[in-house]
Amino acid sequence: MKAVGIIVEYNPFHNGHLYHLEETKKQTGADCIIAVMSGNFLQRGEPALVSKWARTKMALSAGVDIVIELPYAFAVQSAEQFASGAVTLLHSLFCEEICFGSENGNITAFIDAAKTFLEQKQQHDSYVQEALQEGVSYPRANAEAWKRLNATNLDLSKPNNVLGLAYVKAILQKQIPITPRTIRRIASDYHDKTFSHPSIASATSLRKALKGSLAHLETIAPYIPGTTKQTLEQYYDTYGMFHEWEAYFPFLKYRIMTAEEAELRQIAGVDEGIEHRLKQEIVAAPTFSAFMNSIKTKRYTWTRLQRICTHILTNFTKDQRKKTETPTYIRLLGMSSNGRRYLQHVKKHLPLPLVTKVSNLKHDPIYQQEKKASFAYAAIFPEPARTNVLKEEYATPPLLQ
């Protein structure tokens, strides 16, 4: 059986994701589609709209065969670390190809750029440092470095191009025998906040239109599969809310206000004295959005600051980051009958343990952080919903489609 991997967040699963999934099957001839999916917190440093289990259900309903979790230690990281963890996990399940969506749509451009990076890494890094010393953000410094190298025609202001390049770099750096492939995104840009197409919209615009309430679900219904709509309805009916940063702000405020600056300096991503600014601005900030606007600078992008805030919320330290640099297990979140057949075919040969019960992971540093992330994710619920969500983390077996 030919397995093809995709790297996803599905926040939420929408028609653009369905197009990517169907095109991946068509273009690769895959017998089995394996999705490695971020857990309850995402790469841009924000809580997922609904839990990993609800999003797994969306994925399986749409035709994904196997869903595995990208642990927090890789999911809430820079593009390079995110890609490294995801590619390693897909390789551990013997994926022959990975297929990602991009604004560019030309895989040759990604491969050429990744090769250039490996050949000229020292020069690239030197250019990045020069730009950083001028006070610009890392994404802009990185884009400027590529421009100076005259190394690529990729538009690195586009998030999916950045992630796609990171996937290909990870494959080449690790010398992993996976063939990368890309499908051009259609109709909507990743950052689009409005609807400009009758059936395709970005996840950003869908979350904005939803406004954290089921009352606006019909507004986004044309842009999502019926199974996604049903899952969102069920989640809201069960828990009474969708997850947004504002709901977590009181917990973040408590963490920052009661922590010493020395303690904040131990948190992953807290560098260059940003802890002073965090402590200074948190006191008067009435909302998460107001807090972010008060601490944002040219050097510190919104995304970078959101990741720092998420790490503070989940107490992810620099020391823990050092202990969690490569995946140590494959956590199965769900599978179809076809996915089950594939796993039966390969499970005796897997280089990492395939985990269906997290009780087997209680001493694993990567899972210890995952557990803290689950506690943080559930914190906004009243009882008994909070306890029920935490039980999901420990007791839910892989979902079957």
UniProtKB/Swiss-Prot annotation:
Compartment(s) where it occurs, according to its Swiss-Prot or TrEMBL record: Cytoplasm
EC number: 6.3.4.-
TM region(s), chain numbering: none
Main subcellular location of this protein, as a coarse class: cytoplasm
Binding site for ATP: 7-20, 101, 160, 185-186
UniProtKB keywords: ATP-binding, Cytoplasm, Ligase, Nucleotide-binding, RNA-binding, tRNA processing, tRNA-binding
GO BP: tRNA modification
Gene Ontology MF terms: ATP binding; ligase activity, forming carbon-nitrogen bonds; tRNA binding
Gene3D superfamilies on file: HUPs
Keyword Membrane: no
PANTHER family: TRNA(MET) CYTIDINE ACETATE LIGASE
UniProt function note: Catalyzes the formation of N(4)-acetylcytidine (ac(4)C) at the wobble position of elongator tRNA(Met), using acetate and ATP as substrates. First activates an acetate ion to form acetyladenylate (Ac-AMP) and then transfers the acetyl group to tRNA to form ac(4)C34.
Family: Belongs to the TmcAL family.
HAMAP family listed in its UniProt record: TmcAL (MF_01539)
Entry protein name: tRNA(Met) cytidine acetate ligase
Native organism: Geobacillus sp. (strain WCH70)
Gene that encodes the chain: tmcAL
